[in-house]
C-alpha cells in the first residue's frame, strides 16, 4: 500500500471514531480553510452525509478515548514506595510528591488513553495506592 492510500485509510478510521458533534466541528473548520469552486458538484449533498454519520454514530458503541487518573488514598506503611513511584511516573520532585499525597484525592493525569490509565493504575496500586479511572468528558 502506498503512503497516500495508507494515510487515507487511517484518516477514514479516525473519522469513523468521531461523534456527530466532532464531525460537525471538523466540517466547519474545513469549510473555513478550504475554498471550493461554486461549480463543484458533490456526489451527495451535505444533509445526507450528516444523516448517514448520525446513523453510524448512533448504531455504534462509542468507547471513551480519554480518561483521568485520580489518586484517592494510600497505605501509610507504603508511603515511601508511593512517593518514589509518583516521582518516576509524573516527573516531580520529592517535596511535590510528599505534598501531593498529603492532599488526596488528586488527579494525577487528565485526558490519557485507556491503556495508559490502566497501566498507571496497576503501577500505583502495586505501590499501595487506591486509584480511580474516570472518563474524561469530551
Swiss-Prot record:
Keyword field contains Ribosomal protein: yes
UniProt-listed Gene3D superfamilies: 3.30.1390.10
Molecular functions (GO terms): mRNA binding; structural constituent of ribosome
One Gene Ontology term, aspect cellular component: ribonucleoprotein complex
Record localization: Plastid
Keywords: Plastid, Ribonucleoprotein, Ribosomal protein
Keyword Glycoprotein carried by entry: no
GO biological process: translation
Stored Pfam families: Ribosomal_L12
Stored SUPFAM superfamilies: ClpS-like
CDD domains in the record: Ribosomal_L7_L12 (cd00387)
Main location: plastid
Family: Belongs to the bacterial ribosomal protein bL12 family.
Assembly and oligomerization: Homodimer. Part of the ribosomal stalk of the 50S ribosomal subunit. Forms a multimeric L10(L12)X complex, where L10 forms an elongated spine to which 2 to 4 L12 dimers bind in a sequential fashion. Binds GTP-bound translation factors.
Protein purpose: Forms part of the ribosomal stalk which helps the ribosome interact with GTP-bound translation factors. Is thus essential for accurate translation.
The protein's name in its UniProt record: Large ribosomal subunit protein bL12c
